Amino acid sequence: MRLARGIKYAVIGAGVALFGVLFGWVMFPAILKSQLKKEMALSKKTDVRKMWEKIPFALDFKIYLFNYTNPEEVQKGAAPIVKEVGPYYFEEWKEKVEIEDHEEDDTITYRKMDTFYFRPELSGPGLTGEETIIMPHVFMMSMAITVYRDKPSMMNMLGKAINGIFDNPSDVFMRVNAMDILFRGVIINCDRTEFAPKAACTAIKKEGAKSLIIEPNNQLRFSLFGLKNHTVDSRVVTVKRGIKNVMDVGQVVAMDGAPQLEIWNDHCNEYQGTDGTIFPPFLTQKDRLQSYSADLCRSFKPWFQKTTYYRGIKTNHYIANMGDFANDPELNCFCETPEKCPPKGLMDLTKCVKAPMYASMPHFLDADPQMLENVKGLNPDMNEHGIQIDFEPISGTPMMAKQRVQFNMELLRVEKIEIMKELPGYIVPLLWIEGGLALNKTFVKMLKNQLFIPKRIVSVIRWWLLSFGMLAALGGVIFHFKDDIMRIAIKGDSSVTKVNPEDGEQKDVSVIGQSHEPPKINM
């Protein structure tokens, strides 16, 4: 009976330990992975789909303008001196509209709509948006550079057009309220009868219809972000839903129905990466993340830097920069020719935004050192100006993100235009923006409850089952071999020592299995 009971204990214990191993290390991870595949795909009525369609909280949107403190000297060829003004803080609410699912190829199409709300109390000290900013006249310089590059024979006519439209300006700078250049709009006076300004305004209306607001009396209003505010974007984006393969979720496959761009060379025209609002799960440190930026007409590939923590959740920290187009083979195709690549850290956006602009990291971080020599007042700092993203790797959830970019323009020297003939010819900063995400306690708690608490519970259970099973199995074995173990133990402790009378010394004697006979007494 004892034999059967001992074997039973050992078998039960081994079974419990085996179940703990199978459940904790094999079954549960497989179940979790399967469940995540379902939850992270853009299926209808899932929580992820709802959040993807309309993010239920505001993102940070900060704008920093550069105020030029020596415009008169710059007009004569001196290096600009700038002072950063900001941040101007806006809440950014993102949603997707006109959404359509396409079952046959597992894709979904949408247009995006962003809405901005100014929050002066979260902006820089004392900033109201009514501050006067002195900066290069973006619209005027864009006109001049575009004509200079594309139609140099019309430069004389352009000079007359600038004088007519901008009322005989004395320099290339504008003095505007911050909120005017950002959202409300700067007036462009096209109410002219002279041939040159009238012809220029006709061309402006035709080419700039998507970036200008046409007012009564032949006036135009130009702003950097005004037409993006609470306006449905004209571009139709097509992305993968990830139902058939969750690793494809959010991958951009077309813009306006086109499977690739037609403005760059080779693979630079490809849409690589997600739309930036969702990422695939099961990320490893070796994975090279990719997201496509429609505003910059290119993909970004952040790389893993270190492991860190966000509100108690372990995350992978990624960083990125603008790149070196001349020396990076992956980026060469953004240049018309290798000889025409912009300086390190700058990207020519002319083909993308239809305006002579350059993108860089704020304060020319990671750019050619000459850029900092040409402009005084910049102080690049990786923590303040770099692109940073923290991902929870299992679910692919961005926990914290700082997406930063600076927009720049060349102060091009043009001999045939009076106010441009002595400009220094430097690429100079206009403004930089930061789009920020930081999951609040509510959503972090949701992630913990849905993912990490179950994992911890299972982790405790699996180790408990394994430990209990091993102890039970060991106890069963000991119980089964108890008699043999006791016999071996007792035998190991018994000893018989021979007594030699010559020694004159009594030795300890232990005799097992013999009776003691009393000594005889001789009478």
From Swiss-Prot:
Transmembrane found in the keyword field: yes
InterPro entries attached to this UniProt entry: CD36_fam (IPR002159)
GO annotation, biological process: sensory perception of smell
Pfam families associated with the record: CD36
Tissue specificity as recorded in UniProt: Localizes to both male and female antennae but not the leg, wing, gut, head, or thoracic ganglia. Detected throughout the sensory epithelium, associating with both sex-pheromone sensilla and plant-volatile sensilla. Differentially expressed both among different sensilla and different neurons within a given sensillum. Expression coincides with that of several other olfactory-specific proteins that are involved in odor detection.
UniProt topological domain (Cytoplasmic) ranges: 1-10, 480-523
Stretches for region Disordered: 499-523
Transmembrane segment boundaries: 11-31, 459-479
This protein's record includes keyword Membrane: yes
GO MF entries: scavenger receptor activity
Disulfide bond entries: 268-333, 297-352, 335-341
Residue ranges that the UniProt entry lists as topological domain Extracellular: 32-458
Cellular compartments annotated: Cell membrane
Keywords per UniProt: Cell membrane, Disulfide bond, Glycoprotein, Membrane, Olfaction, Receptor, Sensory transduction, Transmembrane, Transmembrane helix
GO cellular component: cytoplasm; plasma membrane
Residues bearing carbohydrate: 67, 229, 440
Topological relation to the membrane, as annotated: Multi-pass membrane protein
Family: Belongs to the CD36 family.
Free-text function comment from the UniProt entry: Plays an olfactory role that is not restricted to pheromone sensitivity.
Name of the protein in its database record: Sensory neuron membrane protein 1
